[in-house]
């Protein structure tokens, strides 16, 4: 059976706890997405439309509007100040959240690996090909993880949230560790996983300890780190083979912004690129910062 809660609920609880336990930058949080851009933009000279929408002065001259390049220029300055005024960035962290199934009887395909109830989630071939490529080829610039809770019911998830224990009850796997497999299975967060097709035992690790052990980039400043990473992501989306619909969706969305020649605003365009990447892949982009927090 599927775990009885929404994946977005787990993601929200997880991110909130991660922010409390370590120093982290959420480049595409809800607040910044609200500043970065709009969900959709339309322009119309139709007086009838403005009247229908209830604008009280529809009989005056049409709105002059604001050019998108003007907004982009302002946002370039805003984002530049923001990333300059935070601690040094360490690495780009991509998290793919998974809501598992909970297998409760011996007819489960992987039961013989555990001989008890266990959790399982599927790997989607095109998505995994992309994530594995990113982690394998980006070197020290990126860490790519699957994150899946060892919780069945939403009330248990809420209990863990209150206890500040969501992360301790999450199973983590690096993307490249699951190459050649189509599923990952586990019984609880702090133990090993067994990946399938051909069973392979994979040891778990402590996410917070891994983040705290990372060292900040010395060669580039925060803005350049973001610009470089988004450029790598853009290249990967263009060149990785076997990602089908992900490539098509990404290109279609990016072509909308290229039409307005937004590439001249490097930091703004980088954030836009990563926003589209998240929209298409569902992958959360986080950046650990230099400095520690007490859990």
Language model regions located:
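Acidic-basic catalytic patches of nuclease active cores, encompassing PD-(D/E)XK
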Residues: 1-36, 41-53
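Acidic, metal/cofactor-coordinating or nucleic-acid-engaging core segments within structured domains
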Residues: 18-23, 85-93, 100-246, 251
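Catalytic micro-motifs at enzyme active sites that drive phosphoryl/nucleotidyl and oxygen chemistry
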Residues: 25-31, 76-85
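Active-site ExK catalytic segment of metal-dependent nucleases
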Residues: 41-43, 50-67, 80-113
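Enriched - but not universal
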Residues: 61, 114-117, 272, 288
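A Trp-anchored, charged/polar loop motif used as the substrate-binding/catalytic surface
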Residues: 66-79, 122-133
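Charge-dense, extended regions
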Residues: 248-295
